[in-house]
Amino acid sequence: MKKIAILTSGGDASTMNKCLSTFITYASKYNCEVVFVKNGYKGIYDNEFVKPDYTETKSWWSLPGTKIYSSRFPEILDEQVRKQMVDNLHKNSIDTLVVIGGDGSYKGARLLSKSGIKVIGLPGTIDNDIASTSYSIGFDTSLNAIVNSIKEIKSCMDSHANVAMIEIMGRHCIDLTVFAGIATEADIIITPESFYTPQQLLAKINEKRKTNSRGIIILYVELLLGTENIPTVEEYIKYIQANSKESVKKNILGYLQRGGNPTAMDMIRASLMTEHALKMISENQYNKIIGVDEFKVVSYDLETAINMKNPSRKDLIDKFFN
């Protein structure tokens, strides 16, 4: 039986708990024993290895956040700190370390792998900034939270014909901003790839007014405005209001984007990736990063499409119910 340690690292993401629940549920099927590491990489250093309670962990499947907690641990860059972490993993007879986190967490896993630790990575971050997967765990939940907030803001903007500038999380990844903009039919998005100066933004707003738009929704990605000689959002608003009759309202959604109840699709993807991690461990595959590839639009001839058969779900039934 292989003993695997699981930790959640970096920023919390809804559906991390679903991963933990799935690991507990299916570990025995793959002849694995699971222990949790509290507080991310710091927990390895502090020797916070805990044996999970099966019944309690099974109840976590729909809870947001991470019940084994997370932390930032830049000390992992120190060789002596890593040596202590490796020693603690060996003392606890850990065969494979599973890291649920983002890009920074993966870099930590790579450092430990170079010290001889077998690692598996699962993409857990709302930012969707991991190039090896189309969707990261928590992204869909965060996106839905953003969409719901925009809908509520839009109704207020429509009532008064105001402009809303809404900051969206994502660090240096624009996916939440772009996808939320598509979903809500936002009027304008501001990203490094679709950038507007205050003057250009006002011109764009004026264009929208010509189409009889009332409430105007502008989404901008965080960590852009106010950096590298770019005006702050307050300076954007000041310019627009000084040079027009527009009333502009600043909104920062902040942590509302991170703590929502997991969506069904997020939980399904988390389950699929977690089960695949267990399968890989049972097959002695390690130093791997798991992801999904789903961003593809296809088309078929009419006759071909009509004659196509719906896919069998037997593989899913076998994975999760047999």
Curated annotation (Swiss-Prot):
Q: In which pathway does it act?
A: Carbohydrate degradation; glycolysis; D-glyceraldehyde 3-phosphate and glycerone phosphate from D-glucose: step 3/4
Q: Name one GO molecular function term.
A: fructose-6-phosphate binding
A GO-annotated cellular component: 6-phosphofructokinase complex
- Sequence positions that bind substrate: 125-127, 169-171, 222, 249, 255-258
Q: Please state the Enzyme Commission number of this protein.
A: 2.7.1.11
Could you mention a single GO BP entry for this protein?
Answer: canonical glycolysis
* Subcellular location(s) of the protein: Cytoplasm
The chemistry this enzyme catalyses reads: beta-D-fructose 6-phosphate + ATP = beta-D-fructose 1,6-bisphosphate + ADP + H(+)
Which positions does UniProt annotate for ATP binding? Answer: 11, 72-73, 102-105
The answer on whether this UniProt entry bears the keyword Nucleotide-binding reads yes
What UniProt keywords apply to this chain's record, in alphabetical order? ATP-binding, Cytoplasm, Glycolysis, Kinase, Magnesium, Metal-binding, Nucleotide-binding, Transferase
Required cofactors, per record? Mg(2+)
Ligand binding (Mg(2+)): 103
The UniProt entry annotates the active site at 127
Uppermost EC category: transferase
Keyword Magnesium listed: yes
Just give the chief location class.
Answer: cytoplasm
Q: Which family does it belong to?
A: Belongs to the phosphofructokinase type A (PFKA) family.
Function summary: Catalyzes the phosphorylation of D-fructose 6-phosphate to fructose 1,6-bisphosphate by ATP, the first committing step of glycolysis.
| Oligomeric and partner information | Homotetramer.
Q: What is this protein called?
A: Probable ATP-dependent 6-phosphofructokinase
Name of the gene this protein is made from: pfkA
